[in-house]
Amino acid sequence: VLKNILVALDGTELAERVIQVLGDLVLSAETKIVFCHVFPTPESELELSADRPHPESPTLSYFHVEKQLQAYQEKLSIQSAIELVTGEPADEIIRLANIYKADLIIIGSRGLTGMKRIVQGSVSSQVVEEANCSVLVVKSK
């Protein structure tokens, strides 16, 4: 039984797909969902990867993201929480998963390939490698 699920959302259209997949899971009444969003630090934004918000959308304000996560929360019939943090996205997702003793992390991946992936890196790949629990990676299509 999945008791704690961390859902990492980045504020893009991929977040909707992640929420769809969450809705497809059969969850028990005891399951707790933690929606999280990591605001990248200025240093990590310089090396923006595919799994992070696009630089042309700096309007992803704290308030906007919080409202979006609250809207997802309202769709759930089970216990949930919201975590908005700042830092290196993969590191913060793993840190939150450890704090909440997550049994599963759900994260989106835009599927960068080739040189872009090598240069920019991938938050989802790093989370898969370093997490202490299972990770469900949701593809954009």
PLM regions: where:
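Small/aliphatic-rich secondary-structure junction motif
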Residues: 2-52
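Active-site phosphate/pyrophosphate- and oxyanion-stabilizing loops and adjacent acidic/basic residues
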Residues: 20-23, 70, 125
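A short acidic, glycine-rich active-site loop
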Residues: 53-64
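Structural beta-alpha unit
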Residues: 73-105
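Gly/Ser-rich helix-loop-strand patches that form or flank binding pockets
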Residues: 4, 96-141
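General small-molecule cofactor/ligand-binding pocket signal
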Residues: 34-36, 81-85, 136
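Solvent-exposed polar/charged
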Residues: 24-27, 74, 98-99, 129
